[in-house]
Every structure is written in structure tokens, then in C-alpha cells.
A protein has these predicted regions:
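RNase H-like, Mg2+-dependent phosphodiesterase core
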Residues: 1-303
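A short, hydrophobic C-terminal helix/tail in secreted or cell-surface proteins
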Residues: 304-308
Length: 308
């Protein structure tokens, strides 16, 4: 079933946040108007924004989803709000398994894939803990704290696969495709949980064009349940919890690798990463024991030197 188009969104904002939104819209030549019970209303193209005196911000129009996701959430609210409005809708309370990964875009460290089983009581507990998409939690310490709380929730089952660099590189050598590795990993953590609990369905964030990338790796138990892959699946509590579990495991394993190497191994694929890779080479340490070798960064250290 296709996702329902989002053309309206409401959230609470402070006076300062409303002023920040107003300034943003003014700079982009929105037309302002008077609206009953509101400080202001503004419109341009396919977007209408109204700041009510009650503290509510109303966003309407076909551009609602894009504007909320790319400006309002990251720049003003500093948290995810779109997709969480129906957080206690019936489908959020159904028994299911959520799956997510961490480390795919990081040069150093493992690829981690986690699955989490939830039901109604577990979801309500996750809501109280403050579970949300791990990408919206900037502090590694906070990720660690929430991950511990998730594992303490009665009945909440977790499974994790951490493909350390050497293992990851061997798999990539065979599969030659990151999505194939992800498909195998997602299927594995799903099957592992299904051996411990009966769940009618599973959901994961969409990383491939078709669900077949995962389904072809499923075994007997996995083939019997509903499986859904969709964009922004982290708005689902089960997937959000899996994203936190995966991120905590990734950060912990990356830290261990750094300790082993005797240097700090940064996240991502920035200039700091290149400097750390150069340090590993200088120390005569095998790069494939610390990094994902198909990244372009590796070409700087594995390609033969050009001849004069």
C-alpha cells in the first residue's frame, strides 16, 4: 500500500522558534497575511505556514513533508515530529520486529544490523524512554543510555550482527554490493529473533528498490510473516529502537578498534578519516582490519604509485 501523502502538519513551538520560522520565510519572499487567533500566516507556492497564539504551528500544502523534514525538524525543532503524530495508532501497537543498520556510510568500523521485537506494552515503554531515530540523537552517551534502557524493557528482544571490517571486506569481495550484504544481514537478524518469538510481521527502512533484496535471504520462519520496507521507517518505534541498538554497537566497536590501533578512528568519511588512515599506514597496521576497503578513501593508500 502506498504511503499516504502528507499535506498537513501541526506541532508546538516557542515564541523564539516561531520568530525563527518567520525570519526564514521572510527571507524567502513568502507573502504574509493576518489570520484569526494567529501571530501571522505566510504562503508561497505549495506551502502555507501559520503561527497561532496558542503556540501551535500549522503547516499545509503539497510541500509540507519536504519543508518539515529538511527545515523545521533539523533547524528549528531539533527533533523528529513528522511521522510521530500517530505514534500510538493501532498499527504502532501491533507485535512486530523492527530492523535497522549503522555504519554503512562510515569508512572505519563495522557494519552493524539490529532487530528489535515489540508489542503494545513494549512500545508504550519505548515512548516513555524517549526512543526516536538514532540520527536525531547527536550524543554517543545518550545513545548508550537509551540502548541500555531498551534492553531492560520487559519482553523486548534484541538481536545484533556486527560485521567487523575483515569479515565485511570478505563478504563484499563475494557479493560486490553493499545492498546485498545489507539484505543478508537484515534477513539474519530477523530469522534470529523469529527463533525466539512469534511475530506476525517485520519492518525495515528502505535501502533497496525492492523487498526481494531481503526476502531472497529469508529462511522458513521469515518467509511466513509479512515484511515491509519503507522510507522513513524510523518513525516506527520498533525500527527506531533498532536504529539506536545498532548505533550503540557501532560506536562501541569503533572505539575498541581505535584502542587496538592506538589512534582515534573518526566516524564518517571526512578529511579526518583520511588523516587517521594515513596514521594506520604509517604504523604498518593492516587497513582492511579497520576500514571498509571499497570506499574511495582506500584508493589513496592501496593504488600503486604513478611512475615518473
Amino acid at each position: 500500500m502506498p504511503e499516504k501523502e502528507i499535506t498537513s502538519h501541526t506541532c508546538e513551538v516557542t515564541t523564539l522558534q516561531a520568530d525563527q520560522v518567520k525570519s526564514y520565510l521572510h527571507d524567502r519572499l513568502f507573502t504574509f497575511r493576518e489570520v484569526p487567533y494567529a501571530f501571522w500566516g505566510a504562503a508561497k507556492g505549495k506551502l502555507n505556514v501559520t503561527a497561532f497564539k496558542s503556540g501551535k504551528l500549522l503547516v499545509q500544502g503539497k510541500d509540507t513533508k519536504e519543508w518539515v523534514e529538511f527545515f523545521l525538524e533539523p533547524e528549528v525543532l531539533k527533533k523528529a515530529s513528522l511521522g510521530y503524530e500517530l505514534e500510538l495508532a493501532p498499527e504502532q501497537l501491533e507485535p512486530r520486529i523492527g530492523i535497522d543498520e549503522s555504519g554503512k556510510g562510515d569508512f572505519f568500523g563495522p557494519l552493524v544490523i539490529a532487530s528489535v521485537y515489540v508489542n503494545e506494552s513494549i512500545v508504550r515503554a519505548l515512548k516513555e524512554i524517549g526512543v526516536k531515530d538514532s540520527k536525531l540523537i547527536k550524543s554517543d552517551k545518550k545513545i548508550e543510555e537509551i540502548a541500555k534502557e531498551i534492553k531492560r524493557v520487559p519482553g523486548c528482544l534484541v538481536d545484533v550482527i556486527a560485521l567487523m571490517p575483515e569479515t565485511y571486506n570478505r563478504l563484499y569481495g563475494k557479493m560486490r554490493n553493499v545492498n546485498e550484504i545489507l539484505g543478508w544481514g537484515h534477513a539474519s537478524v530477523l530469522e534470529n529473533l523469529l527463533c525466539r518469538v512469534d511475530a506476525p510481521k517485520a519492518i525495515s527502512d528502505q535501502f533497496a528498490r525492492t523487498e526481494w533484496t531481503i526476502k531472497k535471504h529469508l529462511k522458513e520462519k521469515g518467509k511466513k510473516i509479512e515484511f515491509h520496507q519503507r522510507h522513513k521507517a524510523e518513525s516506527d518505534y520498533a525500527v527506531a529502537a533498532a536504529s539506536i541498538i545498532a548505533r550503540e554497537e557501532f560506536v562501541r566497536r569503533l572505539r575498541q578498534l581505535g584502542t587496538k590501533a592506538g589512534i582515534d578512528l573518526p566516524k564518517g568519511a571526512s578529511s579526518l578519516v583520511k588523516k587517521a588512515a594515513a596514521q594506520l599506514i604509517k604504523k604498518s597496521l593492516p587497513l582492511d582490519a579497520y576500514a571498509k576497503m571499497h570506499f574511495k578513501t582506500c584508493l589513496l593508500y592501496t593504488s600503486p604509485s604513478p611512475r615518473d
